[in-house]
């Protein structure tokens, strides 16, 4: 008789599985055999309030060996020059701290293991949690913007050729005819159709009166003829 499977599938086959933080070599890299001790305590764990770990991010094209000192200001950014290139130093500690609190940080410190044959994630001595950087600085090259003579670069504005015979009938929002000096012309144009319509009404009324008069005269003539005919009979 077959057995029924479990109602759910667990994430791991065994609850006693031990997750190792041992660092594996990425593709394209070689294993380094001359690892040295990292300046933490004997277990590669940070001693509280006695040591600080700083992360300083440099551009890949900067030769760090030429750097004798690093000007740091915790209140604002600073600048320095290496090989005639200017660089800006920014304190990103607050940004990294907020990312760490939201579990969004991807920064971890790798230190040599006790055997010096592999790397592992550095942890704190208190709760064995991954070690966080006390300070994070980013170094980026600043661009030099050359001086621009705008009087030579600026191109004079050319007006669009005007077409003669056009009439302005619509105005932009916030403007009226007076702003374009066409108030009188527009008013005259508006009055003309009213005059024409009134004149047309007069012509139509006179034609109606004329037709009514003609009908009345025809009716009177017909009545007179009918009376004469009756009188003869």
UniProtKB/Swiss-Prot annotation:
Q: Where is the composition biased (Basic residues)?
A: 208-233
The UniProt regions of compositional bias labelled Basic and acidic residues, in chain numbering, are 179-191
Gene name of the encoded protein? RPA34
Which species? Saccharomyces cerevisiae (strain ATCC 204508 / S288c) (Baker's yeast)
Superkingdom to which the source organism belongs: Eukaryota
Identification of the protein by name: DNA-directed RNA polymerase I subunit RPA34
PTM sites of type Phosphoserine: 10, 12, 14, 60
The record's keywords, sorted A to Z, are: DNA-directed RNA polymerase, Nucleus, Phosphoprotein, Ribosome biogenesis, Transcription
Listed PANTHER family: ACR243WP, DNA-DIRECTED RNA POLYMERASE I SUBUNIT RPA34.5-DOMAIN-CONTAINING PROTEIN
Q: What InterPro entries does the entry give?
A: DNA-dir_RNA_pol1_su_RPA34, Euk_RPA34_RNAP_subunit
The record's note on quaternary structure and interaction partners says: Component of the RNA polymerase I (Pol I) complex consisting of 14 subunits: RPA135, RPA190, RPC40, RPA14, RPB5, RPO26, RPA43, RPB8, RPA12, RPB10, RPC19, RPC10, RPA49 and RPA34. The complex is composed of a horseshoe-shaped core containing ten subunits (RPA135, RPA190, RPB5, RPO26, RPB8, RPB10, RPC10, RPA12, RPC19 and RPC40) where RPA135 and RPA190 form the DNA-binding cleft. Outside of the core, RPA14 and RPA43 form the stalk that mediates interactions with transcription initiation factors and newly synthesized RNA.
Other known facts: Present with 3360 molecules/cell in log phase SD medium.
Q: Record's Gene3D superfamilies?
A: 6.20.250.70
Q: Give the similarity note.
A: Belongs to the eukaryotic RPA34 RNA polymerase subunit family.
UniProt-annotated stretches for the region Disordered: 179-233
Q: Mind listing the GO biological process terms from this record?
A: nucleolar large rRNA transcription by RNA polymerase I; ribosome biogenesis; termination of RNA polymerase I transcription; transcription by RNA polymerase I; transcription elongation by RNA polymerase I; transcription initiation at RNA polymerase I promoter
Q: Could you name the Gene Ontology cellular component terms for this entry? A: nucleolus; nucleus; RNA polymerase I complex
- Where is this protein localized, as stated in its record? Nucleus, Nucleolus
MF terms from GO for this chain are: DNA-directed RNA polymerase activity
A family per Pfam: RNA_polI_A34
Protein role: DNA-dependent RNA polymerases catalyze the transcription of DNA into RNA using the four ribonucleoside triphosphates as substrates. Component of RNA polymerase I (Pol I) which synthesizes ribosomal RNA precursors. Besides, RNA polymerase I has intrinsic RNA cleavage activity. The heterodimer formed by RPA34 and RPA49 stimulates transcript elongation by Pol I.
